[in-house]
Amino acid sequence: MRFIVLLFICSFIYPCYVSSIGFRRISKVSLKKTKCEDGYFQCNSGECIPVDKKCDYIDHCIDGSDEDFECDHLDEKSFITCAKDQFKCKNQECIPAAKYCDMVNDCLDESDEHDGCVKHLNCTNKFLCTDGHCINKEWVCDGRNDCPDGNDEWNCKANKTSSASSCKTENYQYMCANHRCISLKVVCDKKDDCGDGSDEGPGCTQFNCSSAGCQSNCHQTPKGSVCTCKPGYKLQKDNRTCNDIDECQAYGICDQDCMNVPGSYACTCQREYYLENDKRTCKARAGEATLVFSTRTSILGMHVDSEKFFSLATNLNHAVGVAMYGDYVYWSNLEENGYNTIVKKRTYHPQAPNEVIVTTGLALITGIDVDWITKNIYFADEDNHCIGVCTNDGTYCTVLIKDTDKPTGVALLPTQGKMYWSDWGTFPHIAVAGMDGKNVRIFVNVKLEWPKSVTIDYPNERLYWVDAKSKMIESVRLDGTDRRIVLHDIIQEPFSMTVFQNKLYWSDWESNGIQTCNKFTGKDWKILIRNHNKPYSVHMDHSAIKPNIDNPCYSNPCSQLCMLNQNKGYTCGCTLDKKLNADKHTCQDVKKNQHLLIIQGRKFINYYHEFLGKPKVMTLSLQHMSQQSYNNLVNIISDPLSGQIIICHLQLSTPFLTSTTDILRYDPVHHSSEKIVTINKIFFELAFDYIGNNLYTTNTVNQSIEVINLNTKAMTAFYFKDEVPKYIALAPEESKMFVAFQKSMHSISGLTLYEMQMNGLGKRKLIREGLIGPQLPMYYDRDSKTLFVSDLLPGYIYSHSAQDTRILRSGLKSPHSLTVAGDNLFWIESQNKLYSTNFRTASVKQKTVEFDLSKLNDNMTSLPGHLTPYSRDAQYVVTLRKDDIPKHDCQKNNGNCSHVCLPSLITSFICACPPGMELSNDNRTCISHHECSKNEYKCSEHNICIQRNQLCDGIENCPNGEDETSECRIKGRCKENQFMCKNGDCIRLKDRCNSRYDCTDQSDEQNCEKPKCKSDEFQCKFTETCIPKTKMCDSNPDCDDLSDEEDCRKVECTSNEFKCNNGKCIPNTFVCDNDNDCEDGEDEAAEKCYSKIACKMPKMFKCPNGDCISDSLLCNGINDCNDGSDEVHCLSNVTTHLVNCSLNEYRCLGTDICLPKNVRCDGKNDCPQSDDEQNCTYCFENEFACDNKRCIPELWVCDKANDCGDNSDEKNCDGSKRNFIESNECDEFKCSVGTCLPYSKVCDGNRDCPDGSDETGKCQTACTVNNFCKGMCYKTPAGAVCGCQSGYRLAVDMISCEDINECELDICSQMCRNTIGSYECFCKDEFIIRNDKTSCKAVGPAMEFITVTDNDIRKMTHNLHSTTQLLFPLMGVRVSGLDVNAVSDSVYWSNDEFGTIKKLNIRTNEIVTVKIVEHPQALAVDWITGNVYVNDNSHLNTIKVCNLEKGKCATLVKIQDKMKVASVIVDSINRWLFWAEISLEADHPTSKICRTDMTGADMKIIASDLGFVRGMTIDHVKSKLYWSDDFYKTVESSNFDGSQRKVVLTLNMNHALSISIFEQSLYFLSSDNLLSSCKMYGKRSCEHVNIGANNVFRLFSILHISRQVPFANPCDAEYCDYMCVLKKENATCICSDGESIESNSTCNIKNDLKFVESINFSRNTRNISGIYSITIIVLLVSVLLLCVYYYYQKNKLKSKPASNLSCSSIHFQNPSYDRSDEIEVMLDSMASSELSPGQHEYINPINNKGMKAAENNAKKSNQCSEGKNIEEEKQDALIYFVHNSK
């Protein structure tokens, strides 16, 4: 029987091998004949078709190549859902429901017009045609047949039923007695046309027309004779005479002009058009019109008549508005960093560059138009709430309309000097004004909801608009009369509209196309253009719609802007920083002349910020400045008195505290500089007093503020005993200074900001506590009297004025170098970009990118030298200004002060003296001390007094050093447990040499033995403190002496480290890991990470994209490299052509499918894995993204109307999506109409509420009179409202503030320490804190994924260069459980069908296979002992613990009947075992999660009321258990005891198949086979993890040592007879039944007997079958060799094995414990073997199923094409096949 089984298997080897080739993808070979034009697709059969016909589900090519496999229609068909107001075509297209069965084929497959479709129609409120079709009532009797048989035009002068008022004789109508209205022609014709006979009767003969006196015609009726008129005439009130009808009054009777003639009319056309043969339609002369439209990534055009497409611009970031005139096309582009630009490009010149003409002052341009007379560009800026205009080169720009709310579209009428725009804000309307911005008035404001776009029909003088909310197109005359609806019901999701001839054209996001219809009737609707990307703006260009008129601006009468006005003249305009002179033609400065100076290394850039337009940038190079003037810049300060700047640079020396600082004055006008003083000491921060010509410096060592007078070079000082001044800013004209203090030099607490007098006197005023720093750049704006403070680490900018202190901006990345110009605050962030915001009106989120400083590095050499911690990236911005400042007494001969003149608030100024001197009686002159106070000591020379505490301080303060005599040692009287400082002070002895200064003279840290720092630590130079090396050169001083930020460019990193540009050393494993560890991202730079580096592991193939894969994955028919390179040059009987995608194409994930880039993020799934629609942004910031990818205004969310079409805007309306208008609460201020505003916009002098309710009431008195707030105070119309600074919240009394414990908000990824007003995050030993200071990064090698696919088990790294290593081939066998052991670098997996558990050591390739569990499913590994906890899903259903090396298992838990276990997990640290039990109740699953210790004792149910718990994982850092629930599609978490249970993730469509935790991010594999990760701390965001579609299926695990920290194994100290497992405190011995026994004890013999019986049975079977086995093996080998040799010769050089199903080695196995008889035969003639060289497999079965399995397999049918069958034979029969391709 066994021999038959072997022959049966062998006979199918070749068919299986051949069938495996069928997995290879076959590409069609292109048979191109001639090249098609742009916009056309070339069929393989040679013909050309429009590109939009490709992949539309209809064969247009003869050979059908336009619908071939590249279209990838595949599974998306069954998932498309159309909205309720749509009809779903058979080809899955969605069309408006009104277009179903309307006698027009709107579906591309014509499925909307199938036979019998009229049976499904409901013609309510419509006209019913004879055949059952429906048409609009407006189309009845309009002179055109709309019903198939034309019955909508029958009896048009005799409606079926009517009233007496509408059934009139003058209209050739007759009213029957039954109210039926019939034609006069059929009255008295001897036929009953009325149906009641009332149209016939005696009266038809009794009355005579001769006596009627009719002017024209007469008709007999039963009621008497009636007069009628000829066509074209109308019967008058006398019912006898006729007058001519003016047909021209009928709407739409002519395309353009109409001329009335007696009895008729004639249509005429304007000069630029001609009348077509229908005598009604006007056709434009001078060639075809061009329809231009934007599609996010490109600007496209189409010739309207020929429908030929062409491209104008491609590879754009986000094009929105578009316009075209003459030789240029213009568009607005939304840049990646969020700011808008206006770009122009020459038309019909594909190679012409894109010229950015407007770069500054734009936010969101949705509408743009060009005045073809002046060439000016007009635009609507939705986010800046304005209408603006620029010259066509962007040189001059200005704002015309400032107070509009949400402008979206703009249309120009140059012939009348007018412009129109739509506004969909709080009060939707359409407005009109002159093109110079004057005479603004509301044009339409009734029945408008979302007017999205406006356009003008110039010949007919009508304005058209499209309303995206009411889904309607309307029009009105330009005089405001005759408003009409053109089209409704069919409009879906319009964006922009234009008009030309008798057609309307609009872009529609629902169909991703351009639609068109008749502009009068709405008829002839169709989709003109279909596109992959959403179309944005549309624009029509033709000379006929842009008639020339005299240009009044032709002679350049204006110095800047010249605009048309409504008086057929012109108006001059100026940029925002200028105003018109009295001559109304020239411009003058309206503000003080000021601009910015950007300094980056040697580059000095004059940056002219004019708020709107194109900034003027000039680069200066100062050759006459010495080289060292550019080194180590530590501060740049503006001097508004002279218009110059003060430059400070550090001259480094060793030791650091002996460094000096040079102060230079730079003249930006003459580009000259001079050194004014050298400070021979180190200072922390510097500020300049332009009134007294003083430099204020903070000295952290002496805990003082030192003032240096630049006139006399003399110095005075203010000392602070208990705190250290660090940061300083001055307001000289107000005699104020702002100083940030820290508790002490070595304190880790936050900074406290105070307001003080500049003379150091008087009481201090607290401004803010709890500032984090570690840097605190400040700037005081003298105009607004506002202090701006940047808290670097949290990314806040605060503003402080007399009115309030508030957060101006948040969420910034290390904002530094603050300055102000006008109403704008400027700063630089770590991305090397200059940002600005209007500090008077800005919201907390508003900022604008002004200038990209990184572009300056393109042609620059880097600045040599050290970058100090004060100068993060050697970039500064200051405001150059020269103001008329009133003269001050200090400016007159230094106030007659002999040394220092200090501005003072009360007495104008005071004179100050250096230490050791005092003012004389004249209060001007400083003299030496003659008498010393009791707290002073008088030196014997020069009459100098010193402080008494300066005695014996180790510093010679007296000229002769008498204060430091040998007697100093005996002066002190310190206790035995104290240390005496040199100055005589006593401190605790344990504070001596603790790396912190406790003696005021710092003598406690002298002559100390240096502490020994670890190899991964850095020792501070002066304080000798040890800090982690990772904190070196991170721009945050951690050493008190700042030495960790010193000489960073000279730092040498070890061979295992990578050096960042700023000198920071990071582990090499952090390089190219997709995580920026260097502050500037240098460790992830493309030139490093995409270089041609060989794969680090042997037997790996290097893909061209940098990825590495196992050699065994080559030529397997699967695209493992993701670029197809692993499937090139493969020997096969089928030639496969893999295409290399071009730069303008997108490759679908894991395939060789190349798609045009414009299908990326087009709202439709074009790739098999839908990866082209991942990480996309479809909607603008003020819009809501529907689930169906539609975009609607946020105002429509939760307004009880289904605006999305899929009702997603009305979901979760009791939660976070509630519409703020519907809500009763606002976070801050609520306007009377319901609008919410931040307090910063309330009572600020600007009407921000639509009704102005934010500027009324008590705005003038709030917070100024009886201010009861103890924190911040906000002005409101209702009075003062108290608030708190960041880090605090209002207390219960709503007046005072209390600290927020941010740690309770789970803001840190691991551990958190709350501080007053702030918090600090820190990490466990196996992690380091990231640059964001909140998340922790695991130390060690890169994290690796262990994944299960259909074919194998793989190991993958997820970084810029992923490595995919095939660990073990599965050949179709399903893996039921998976886990890893990072300590031993092993992978474990189970298979419940064949009862196997395998362990693979990744390092040694050693494989252990055991068959000691009948049906093993879920498993978990205890990484300390190596034990495996597994669920045995046999009839007993238990959880066992197994030692694979010993081949032993013990039963720990018995599961209840009808319960199943789907997940098991262990916590080796806390010694817990968790599992989920599942049962089916009432047709739905229910689950509970149970917990025991690792011996199976102390069971507790920690969670119940669950659905189907499939996966579990543990966060060992935070001791949290996570589980996924398939039924409820959620992921939940709880503590180990079940407390604090909560839902952490809700999945909408899919459920999580497998979950894991790494670095406090939850990784989950969803049922659509996509791997994602979600942060479980802070703002919990999720992202897709791209590891390739072919690299995982159902199961994965994460391998990293930080997840399984090594611990000593307590079982090593135990001597167990059977097995050792972990227990709470240590370990314990157990027997096979799970019972615990003492160490060195023996298990109960009864327990072992069961096991022995099993062994004996196996041995008996083995003995009986031994002889037969040898015979069978010999025969089998002979037959198999012949079989293989035959097929090998048959296919020699013809193909290469491409499947994992090919045979490489045969293991003969007779199941037994006795391995001595095992025979292994290797067949080297095969292409590959299962086990790699050095790889070993050990089989340890407990039962012998061989004979029974062989008999069963002999009866099986041929299922060889399935890999699973091979594994069945491998496990259950006498032989099995193992393959490991190379």
Swiss-Prot record:
Keywords: Calcium, Disulfide bond, EGF-like domain, Endocytosis, Glycoprotein, Membrane, Receptor, Repeat, Signal, Transmembrane, Transmembrane helix
Disulfide feature: 36-48, 43-61, 55-71, 82-94, 89-107, 101-117, 123-134, 129-147, 141-156, 167-181, 176-194, 188-204, 248-258, 254-267, 269-282, 932-945, 939-958, 952-968, 974-986, 981-999, 993-1008, 1013-1026, 1020-1039, 1033-1048, 1053-1065, 1060-1078, 1072-1089, 1095-1108, 1103-1121, 1115-1130, 1141-1154, 1148-1167, 1161-1176, 1179-1191, 1186-1204, 1198-1213, 1226-1236, 1231-1249, 1243-1259
Protein's cellular compartments: Membrane
Transmembrane segments: 1664-1684
LDL-receptor class B repeats: 327-374, 375-416, 417-460, 461-501, 502-544, 1385-1425, 1471-1518, 1519-1561
N-terminal signal peptide: 1-18
Main location: membrane
One Gene Ontology cellular component: apical plasma membrane
UniProt domain EGF-like: residue ranges: 208-243, 244-283, 552-588, 889-927, 1262-1298
InterPro entries registered for this protein in UniProt: 6-blade_b-propeller_TolB-like (IPR011042), cEGF (IPR026823), EGF-like_Ca-bd_dom (IPR001881), EGF-like_dom (IPR000742), EGF_Ca-bd_CS (IPR018097), Growth_fac_rcpt_cys_sf (IPR009030), LDL_receptor-like_sf (IPR036055), LDLR-related (IPR051221)
Keyword Membrane included in the entry's annotation: yes
GO biological process: receptor-mediated endocytosis
Expression tissues: Expressed in ovaries of reproductive females.
Entry's Gene Ontology molecular function annotations: calcium ion binding; cargo receptor activity; hormone binding
Extracellular side: 19-1663
PROSITE patterns for the chain: ASX_HYDROXYL, EGF_2, EGF_CA, LDLRA_1, LDLRA_2, LDLRB
Domain LDL-receptor class A: from-to ranges: 35-72, 81-118, 122-157, 166-205, 931-969, 973-1009, 1012-1049, 1052-1090, 1094-1131, 1140-1177, 1178-1214, 1225-1260
Function: Involved in uptake of vitellogenin by endocytosis. Expression is regulated by the juvenile hormone analog, methoprene (in vitro).
Protein name per UniProt: Vitellogenin receptor
Annotated source species: Solenopsis invicta (Red imported fire ant)
Gene expressing this chain: VgR
